[in-house]
Amino acid sequence: MTAQPIRTRRLDLVPVTGEILSADLGDHKRLSRLLEAEVPAAWPPAEMNHEVLSEFYRMETEKTDPLFACWYWVLDEPGAAGRVLVGSGGTGSAISDQKTVLIGYSVLDAFQNRGYATEAVQGMIPVIFSHTRISRIMATTFPELKASIRVLEKTGFACTGPTLAGDGLEEGTLGFVLERGAWETHLPASGSRPRDS
């Protein structure tokens, strides 16, 4: 999947490149220049540790997953002091189903509970479903992560219950699914649009 720039009401979703991920792994000044945004000292979010970033870099540069795409979320709110990196989100292939894509996201603690994740996921969904072979988007989250559950519910995902060991998903998580047909029937008003390159 080729990520394209996405603009929502308050966010620029910047597609990652090998260069961006390389900078994130060791040179936040360069990352700041590449994103044209401040990179907070607390970056990256806890879920995006060095191991995860290294795997993203490998998938991006080696093109091992045809459904891998990732965006860095830059807050670019009119009237704000400047652009700030606040989170990220991306997609990857489901192990057992070529028509399902997995979605994940994370936001820095200082920027949580402001609606950024909901806004970004709403912006990502039309881009994901623009790939006609994708019929389902799946996400997982832990039951105690209430804010993450709210993001999924607000963006139209339905809870499918606890995930099972052996499905390639983390045991103890809840599964959520957004079917293309349900999304097309109830298109969310995200205000997002792919940006011309």
Where do the model's predicted regions map?
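Ser/Thr-centric signal marking residues that sit
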Residues: 8, 118, 141
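GNAT-family acyltransferases
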Residues: 1-102, 107-110, 123-131, 144, ...
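Short hydrophobic alpha-helical segments of the AMP-binding
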Residues: 128, 141, 152
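Conserved active-site alpha-helix within GNAT-family acetyltransferase domains
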Residues: 118, 144-161
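Conserved GNAT acetyl-CoA-binding A-motif
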Residues: 131-140
